[in-house]
A protein has these predicted regions:
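Alpha-helix initiation/capping motif
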Residues: 7, 100, 113-119, 170, ...
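Terminal amphipathic helices with adjacent charged low-complexity linkers/tails
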Residues: 132-189
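Short low-complexity stretches enriched in small and charged residues
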Residues: 21-23, 45-46, 88-90, 175-183
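Glycine-centered secondary-structure boundary/capping sites
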Residues: 13, 108-110, 179
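STAS-typified acidic loop motif
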Residues: 1-8
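Helical mechanochemical/support elements of P-loop NTPase systems and associated helical scaffolds
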Residues: 10-14, 140
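Conserved catalytic cores of soluble enzyme domains
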Residues: 32-156
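A structural preference for short, pocket-lining loop segments at secondary-structure junctions
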Residues: 1, 13-39
Length: 190
C-alpha cells in the first residue's frame, strides 16, 4: 500500500511491537521494504517515526535488533533499519537510501545508477551498514534464523550450547591469553 511507505499509524504499531519486545527482552526483527514516510500524512508521520527511532535506540545494546533489507528502503525508514545490530541485505532487491535516489545528482547526471549508490554491495563493502548479503528474501530470512539460533530466547537466559565432542575445538590456551586483571597488558597479536 502506497509503495510500502510508513504513515503515523504504522510507525505507532511498530513502536508498540518494539515495546513488547523490550518488556519480554526478546530480539527485534525488522523486515524493511518501502518508500519512506507518507507525504500526505505530513509532519505527524515524521513525529511518530521519531518516537519509533527513539525506542529502537533505547533498545540498542539491551536486546538484539535485526534488520532485513528486502527491497528499496528510503528516508527515515533507512535510518531505522540502520540502528540494528545485524543488518542483512538482499542482493536481489535490497537498496538503502537516505533520500530518493531520483534526486541524487550523480544519478540525475547519469554518472551512476541507483544500484551503484545504495545496493547490498555498496552497504556491505563501503558504508558498513550491511553485515551480511543474502541472495534473495528467502536467503535473508534463513540467515537471520541462523543468527537467532546463536542467541538465547531472551537477554536474561544463557545462550544455547552444543558440545561437539571434537577435542580439536577445545583451546585451553585461550584461558591464558587475557589476564584476569583488566589493567594488565597483553599481546593482541596472539
Amino acid at each position: 500500500v502506497f509503495g510500502g511507505s510508513m504513515g503515523e499509524m504504522h510507525a505507532a504499531k511498530i513502536t508498540r511491537t518494539i515495546e513488547m519486545a523490550e518488556r519480554s527482552r526478546t530480539p527485534i526483527i525488522g523486515m524493511w521494504d518501502g518508500g519512506g514516510q507518507r507525504a500526505h500524512d505530513g509532519v505527524t508521520s515524521l513525529a511518530e517515526t521519531g518516537v519509533l527511532m527513539d525506542h529502537l535506540v533505547q533498545c540498542s545494546g539491551r536486546i538484539p535488533i535485526f534488520s532485513l533489507i528486502l527491497g528499496p528502503v528510503v528516508g527515515a525508514s533507512a535510518l531505522c533499519a540502520g540502528i540494528a545490530d545485524f543488518t542483512i541485505m538482499s542482493s536481489q532487491h535490497g537498496q538503502l537510501f537516505l533520500s530518493s535516489p531520483l534526486v541524487t545528482p550523480e544519478i540525475i547526471s547519469g554518472e551512476q545508477t541507483p544500484k551503484e549508490v545504495g545496493d547490498a554491495q555498496v552497504h556491505s563493502s563501503r558504508s558498513g551498514i550491511a553485515c551480511l548479503v543474502a541472495e534473495d528474501e528467502d536467503d535473508a530470512i534463513e540467515m537471520a534464523s541462523e543468527l537467532l539460533g546463536f542467541l538465547p530466547d531472551h537477554c536474561l537466559a544463557d545462550p544455547p550450547f552444543a558440545y561437539s565432542g571434537d577435542e580439536r575445538d577445545l583451546f585451553p590456551e585461550l584461558n591464558e591469553l587475557i589476564p584476569d586483571n583488566p589493567n594488565k597488558p597483553y599481546d593482541m597479536r596472539k
